[in-house]
Amino acid sequence: MDGLPDAGKPPIAMKFGISTHLYHDQRLSREHLSAIAEAGFEAVELFATKSHFDYTDPAAINSLAQWLRETGLTLHSIHAPIWDVFGGTTGSSYSTAAADNAKRQAAVRQAEAALAIVRDIPASYMVVHLGTTDANNGENSRAAASRSLEEICQFAEPLGVRIAAEVIPNDLSSAHALVAMLERDFDGSTVGICLDFGHAHLMGDVADAIETAAEHLITTHVHDNRRRADEHLVPYRGTIDWPAALLMMQKIGYDGTYLMELAANGDPSAVLADAQRARQRFERALSE
């Protein structure tokens, strides 16, 4: 980040995007991207699940490139695979922090396969989960997580992509834990933090997580919940203190994209309309 804007300079231009997570239960289509663009959003994050978008299929990648050109959207980021089928109830799941090295390597290979999209479609970031939310299943090894992150960064650096470790509800991935790992094991040039507001809310105080991650914060996942489950609600539909959270984002001088990662809840078009209204509230709050 560039820090707080100097007095007399124009305000930071706010950028907003939507994750294709909104359509995660469907095969991604041009119509989905058109709806996002028509709702006034500038960017997308591709949720890389093979049942949603087959990132290993050259024809699918070519189609995505064409859809992005036609809709005027930018591919802001790619979410590294955590399953190969929506919902994770069938097929394979992937953990970059698996203690079993074969499982860990499988997760890294899938992340690299999804990241290879940027050879055809430019993107700035890949968002990576370190481990899983179940701390008792052998998937959350600190050493394995650090090794995986290093390997993915080595693959990403020549492609000009920065890796963002996501704040998720486990011991490896709180804002405090991620900062400790990055400052211990990485030089900061190719890896940072994706501040997931909803996940931070499940674990504690969102404003505190933002302040903790500040020097490493490079992208976001914006959604809400009622602190009972990871609901991926539109902002202001849960119990996050958004005025306090956005004030802290201003305080740390965040100048990146606010990327909404929302659940469809049966009606993606209604969610998009609600997201438009939330964006307007963000813009007003961040302009004060």
What is the predicted role of each segment?
Residues 20, 33, 55, 90, ...:
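Gly/Pro-rich active-site loop or hairpin
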Residues 36, 44, 68, 107, ...:
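Conserved, mostly hydrophobic/aromatic
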Residues 42, 74, 124, 218, ...:
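Short acidic/polar active-site loop segments enriched in Thr and Asp
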Residues 43-44, 50, 78, 147-239:
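Acidic/histidine-rich catalytic cores of soluble enzymes
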